């Protein structure tokens, strides 16, 4: 009889290499926020992948960057602290881009860890196969990797193969979570991330990092409908106008798109009510950051 494998795996990489796309691909639900804006993951989101022979808990860490404010400091601490808690590390890179200073910074950080490190070259659907080996050789000059696997998280190419390879390095162990549990975050947090994702998709470059979303109330009104009330926080009045849009059109579209995904998540009809409020310089206010759900790990 095959032994059951279970373990915790950290997905690390510089911003926008496809970490959240990978997470959502293997879990099969939208757990991690996806956007073309950098630094969209603010918390280590645990996604639980359960198969007959294994259960893998993925930690989607914030993209590595130089912090510019207290929220950025917290994002970096989350990323680094995660490395000490896990059984394997996925270092994900964009195979379509040259090795950047961010990649070098991460590899310097990973050189001395004793945990198995997998180099996962994502977005192979965007490059010619002949370009793959030269890129792999470039990374091998920096450090030795446990395994090197090219994938496309968006298209699903080679993802199952990578999971099979990863499982061989995980310890034998029990299921930590029930079969139907896909995340350890409360539903309110995932709902707030869905709303934030839609805002990122619909707003300009000025807005993304100044956006915070808090679910104020989420109640089941009856067997068929859940009521969700959420507040969108921005840092300036001008940003509030951008999020609301002319005649409220932008906010209405955010609500429409978010409601669709929230209904998929909850398996129920959703009544979604959104407000937009200005909270000046909120990313530098520790208590407010904590209130938003970005809670620092206790020693």
Swiss-Prot record:
It comes from Staphylococcus haemolyticus (strain JCSC1435). GO terms for molecular function: GTP binding; GTPase activity; ribosomal small subunit binding; small ribosomal subunit rRNA binding. CDD domains: Era, KH-II_Era. The keyword Cytoplasm applies. Gene3D superfamilies: 3.30.300.20, P-loop containing nucleotide triphosphate hydrolases. This is GTPase Era. One of its GO terms (biological process) is ribosomal small subunit assembly. GTP binds at residues 13-20, 60-64, 122-125. Residues 151-153 are annotated as: G5. It is a peripheral membrane protein. Coiled coil: none annotated. PANTHER family: GTPASE ERA, GTPASE ERA, MITOCHONDRIAL.
């Amino acid at each position: 009889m095959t032994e059951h494998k279970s373990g915790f795996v950290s997905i690390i990489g510089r911003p926008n290499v496809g970490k959240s796309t990978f997470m959502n691909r293997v879990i099969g639900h939208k757990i991690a926020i996806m956007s073309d804006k950098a630094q969209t993951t603010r918390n280590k989101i645990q996604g639980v992948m359960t198969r007959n022979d294994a259960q893998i808990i993925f930690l989607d860490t914030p993209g590595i960057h130089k912090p510019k404010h207290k929220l950025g400091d917290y994002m970096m601490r989350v990323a680094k602290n995660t490395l000490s808690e896990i059984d394997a590390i996925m270092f994900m890179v964009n195979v379509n881009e040259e090795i950047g200073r961010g990649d070098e910074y991460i590899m310097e950080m990973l050189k001395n860890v004793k945990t198995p490190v997998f180099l996962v070259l994502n977005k192979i659907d965007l490059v010619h196969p002949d370009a793959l080996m030269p890129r792999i050789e470039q990374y091998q000059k920096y450090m030795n990797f446990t395994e090197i696997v090219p994938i496309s998280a968006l298209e699903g190419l080679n993802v199952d193969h990578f999971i099979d390879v990863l499982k061989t390095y995980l310890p034998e162990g029990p299921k930590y979570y029930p079969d139907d549990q896909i995340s350890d975050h409360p539903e309110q947090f995932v709902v707030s991330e869905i709303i934030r994702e839609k805002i990122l998709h619909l707003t300009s470059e000025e807005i993304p990092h100044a956006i915070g979303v808090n679910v104020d109330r989420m109640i089941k009104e009856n067997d068929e409908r859940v009521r969700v009330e959420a507040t969108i926080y921005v840092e300036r009045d001008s940003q509030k106008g951008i999020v609301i849009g002319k005649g409220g059109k932008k906010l209405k579209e955010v609500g429409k798109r978010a409601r669709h995904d929230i209904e998929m998540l909850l398996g129920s009809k959703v009544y979604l009510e959104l407000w937009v409020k200005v909270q000046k310089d909120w990313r530098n206010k520790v208590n407010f950051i904590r209130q938003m759900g970005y809670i620092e790990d206790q020693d």
